[in-house]
Every structure is written in structure tokens, then in C-alpha cells.
Amino acid sequence: MKKLLMALMLGMTPLLAICAEPAASADKPLLMAGKHELYQRVLSVPGARMVKEAGGKGSTEVTPFTAFYVYARFTLDGKQWLEVGTDRHGSRAGWLPIASTIEWNHGLTAAFRDPVSHDRVLLFKDKESVRELARQKDLTVYDKLYQEAAQGKSSADSPVIAIQPPGYIDIREDFYLVPIRQHEDIYLGSERARLLQISSVPLEREQAAPDVKPVAAKDYSAGLVFVIDSTLSMEPYIERTREAVEKIYDTLGDAKLLGNVNFGLVAFRDNLASAPQLDYLARTYVNLEQGSNGADFLSRVKSLKAATTSSRDFNEDAYAGVKQAIESMNWTGHEARYVVLVTDAGARGADDPLSSTGLGTASLRQLAQDKGVAIFVLHLLTPATMADHARDAEQYRELADFPDIGSLYYGVPTGDVNKFGKALDAVAGQITEQVRVAANDGELAMPVPTSDDVQLANLQSRVAKLGHALRMRYLQKAEGGQVPSVFDAWMLDRDFRGPERPTLDVRVLLTRDQLSELHDILKQVLDKAEEGLLSPQNFLNELKSLAATVSRSPEQLGTTTATTAGKGNSLADLGFMREYIEDLPYTGEVMGLSLDDWQSWSTLRQVAFLNRMEEKVSYYRALHDHIDLWVSLDGGPVSGDSVYPIPLEMLP
């Protein structure tokens, strides 16, 4: 990192050409309005069929959500048609009815957040209705519209045409797209919001069963994996964890619910390169299948002992243990998924040369959320690490933050074993009770915690809220909740009742091959900068070119940066940067970064920025390898064409 920063400060000569961009065909698609380089694109909707000529017969089925360039528009007998191609170099594929497509002039799509802490999103027929409602900020009018939509009783003249489904929709299981077509900045009170024109399209598989059977309450299960620091001095906490798990198995046995809560255990130490005497970096002692039985779990963890020698410093590779728990466990069948990290040391982040994962806090948390895993942290605030308490606590609070719930962090004062045990019993017991109540088809109450430990009471409140949300997700599977199929609607990206709360996550749809290419290009840009082949200005231009391409037209990756297309061929060099960025509704962190900004930053801030870029490279590699997250739109096995909507904040 120091070498990379020094190279950027020196500002040496730009990178030489590596390869030339292929010559474009004279047969080009239609340009977007007001653009000179960006072409019109569309996505095929599920059920679309292509013909060789407009109005012709002998159609062929098109894979849902395939991106096409638009080469011609034609109206025949009142029906509008598009001639489309697979690239922008003249490869025309055929004709599609315009009704079988949606605009796709950039790759940004919205994903509905779980409405656990905000109202469901209302979809309006026109933007004037939303504008007027936002201007008046009249909760009485809003409540009437909301209740009518929620009850399915909106009148024919209501401005509301649809509402977000009541429960969380897991995009991995029920894939959908909400492409953002236009946007407008408005205010809800004093909060800035965006008014979005969208299309909402679920992926409706033909092979999906027509009848959805009600889920069985007794089948609701939780997977809870302990990730325990097993370095020197951790023996009392390891023993207390065994004790807590043994109690829970007894409780589950009494309730005849063994198998409804499965436990796993991963132990971690530190990088063996710096401390080979530690024996291992991370080791799985019990997986979730083995942890369905108490006797099996306890026998397998008998051999877990704390190390007898210390690691190199007060930081340890906790993220290696968490990542192993996320990746090595079979979470299938567990509706509630938890990792409980127990440690007295700070974690080695992406900027630490001894980090084995290359992941920082944000990217590891995102990887967990991609897999539907909530991370708890029981942070032992021992006297030995007092100097690092504040820094480490900030790191772990961020790691344990769960969307719309809050941070699942608990700092154990002085590392007291009894207080640790009390917190562990409370959290694990609460999760077990949630499963017991669900199995008996009871109402999951949201009790006010009675602990006189304010920090623990706050954590228990969040555990209750999280458990309720996860159970609601499970029960609402029976409702077959899909996003509404709406070709043209307007919505707000903020909660009308509480405008400080976002209701959407912004994502970019990429194929697995495109993510791999993004990984390689970003790594090359960072490597070339470290070698001194990019000036600060050229470095920023490369990052901006890459970010703009990913958001606007990811199939062009490899042709819009000097690193891959040769000197003078980046978007910035060609003068196309503004065209790519100017009307995007959302942008990543590099888009608005200027050379003046960079040069005004402190060295620490520059280093933090570079660390984030390197961390994203590691995240792309990890995400690419998680086969279960990728969606094959044609229903086939996972391939390079499989897709996943990447969170915008994880892109450059």
C-alpha cells in the first residue's frame, strides 16, 4: 500500500498501450437521445419471443432479461417492434415486440428492502401524483392510499397502481428486476429523496409449481455458528461456550426440537507466516450437520484448546474465521442464519499485510448479507488490549450491523467471564426460544428486555426484532410473494413516514464473467499504479472509466480503460466521461472524485481509499466463487452468463 501511494504521489508517466479496441462496424445501433457514444439498449422480459422480421412467424424463445442493442424501431399494424442485436458492432439478432422489452440504458436496478422497519413502497401511475404528495407531506392522504393498497382495495381512480409485497423477497430465490428508467431529485420535508420511474419485472419460471404449499411452522430452523478466538488466554471463554451450548441442547431435547437449531464451531488463530507455532489459521471443529446432535457437538469440540503461545501482536485474523464460517457451512434449510464471533483482539483488515482474506469490514459484512447471515460480535474488552478497545469496537460494530435492525455487537466489560456467559446465554437462549415458539405456531412476542445491563437489553431488543423479521420471511413464503409486474410506475426511494430511512438498495446487474473481468481490470489498474505507471490524474481517470462502464454498459468492460484498451482509449481520454455519468440516478464513490479532491486529502484518507479499492478486488473474487448466489436466467447450471445484482457501494 505504501508503495502504491508513493507511486501516485510521484505521478510518473501513463501506462503504455496493451491492446487496441476492435474496429467498430459502420452498422451501429440507435443512439440514446442527446448522446454521441451511448446506444439504446433493452432487456427482454420473461416470455419474450423473437422473430426474423417484424410481424413474422416462427418465433424463438429468448432467455429472460437478455440485454440487446436497439438497431431499428418499426410500427406494423399499430404494433411497435424493435430490431435488436447482441452487440454494438452490427450483430443483428431479430425483432422483438416493444411490449416484450424494457428500457435498459444503464445497468442500475433497485431491490426492495425488507419492510421490517418502514412502510412498503407504493408504486404510482404518474410522477405528478408523487410530487404533489411529497409537496403536501400530508400523512392523512398518504395513510388512506397506503391502507387501500395494502388491503388490495385501491379504487380505479387511485394514483397508486401497486404496492411492494408484505414480506422480504430473497432475490436469490425469487429473482426480479426493477430497472430505473428516469429519476428526479425532490425533498420529503428536509430530507433529500429521489423520485424514480421504474419497471418491475419478476422472473416467472415455467417450471415453478403452480400451487405453493403452506410452510410448516415446525420446520422453521436456525443455524448458529460460533467463531471463537482460540489464541492464548481464551480457554475460559471456550469452556463457557461449551457450557452454554450444552444447556441449549438440553432445552431443545425437552421441547423435542433437536434438529431445529443446529450449532457449528470454527476456531481461528492468526497468520502462520508470522507465528507458525499457532498450528492453524482457521479450523472447522463442527459443521451444522454434525451440530444437530448435542453429544456429537460436544465430543467434537473436546479437542479445542487455546494456544499455548501468543500471536505476533494484539490483532488476529478473525475475518479468516468468519469467512470460513460463512463459506464452509451448508446453510441450506436454515431460515435463520447466525455467526457469533467471540474474540478479545482486533481483526486484521484488508490493509493488513498479514490478512489472509484481503477483506475489510464492509466487504465481509456484505458477503455475509449476500448469504443471508447475521453476524453477532461478543467483544472481550480485556485489560491487555485496552489501548485498542475504541478502534476495535468501532470495527466490530460495523461488522455486526444488520440492515434495518442495527448492530448486533456486545462489548464484554473487562472481559469478565461471568458477564460473557450471561450475554451468550441471553442471545443463544433468545434465538432458541424464537425457534420453539415458531415450532409451536405461537405468536412471536416482541418483549421489552428486563436486563439491568443497558447494553445487553439493547442487544436483546435487536435480536427480538431480527428474529421476528426472519420468521415473517419464512411464513410469507407460503404467500408466493412476488414483486408486482408493472411496466411503468413511479416511486420514492425513501420512506414517506420516515424519510431518513431508505426503502431500496441500488444494485448493478452483472454476469459472472463480467464480475471476473471487473476483478481483473481493477487489480491491473491498482498494480500499474503501484508500479508507478499511472499519474494521479490517470489513476483517477482509469477508476472513473471503469466505474462508469460498469454502471452504464458492463459488456464494454475491457474497452474503456487505457489499462486494457491502450493509451488514449479510456472514457476520460476520449471525452466521453460526462456523457456516461451525467444522468445516472446513483453513482459510486469515485465518480465525483477530482484531482483537486485527491490532492487535498491527507495521506491517511488516501490510504483508506486505496484500501477500499483493494478490498473490493477481494470481495469480487469471493463473490465469484459463491456458486449458490448466482442466478441462471435460462434455468440451466451456473455459468459465465449467470447473473447477480451487485450492491452499488461494492463497485468502484
Kindly give the residue locations of the regions a language model identified.
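Acidic, polar low-complexity linker/tail segments
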Residues: I171-V225, T231-E239, T251-D254
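P/S/T/G-enriched low-complexity
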Residues: Q366, L380-P652
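Solvent-exposed loop/turn segments at secondary-structure junctions
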Residues: H89-S91, I102-E103, S230-M234, R269-A275, ...
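Von Willebrand factor
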Residues: K218-R337, V339-V340, A347, L378, L381, M386
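Loop/turn elements at helix/coil->beta-strand transitions in domains of secreted/extracellular proteins
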Residues: A222, L258-G264, A295, A306, ...
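SH3/SH3-like beta-barrel superfamily modules
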Residues: P22-D27, G58-A99, K144, E148-G189, ...
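Extracytoplasmic, non-cytosolic globular domains
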Residues: R242-Y249, G253, I326, V340-G349, ...
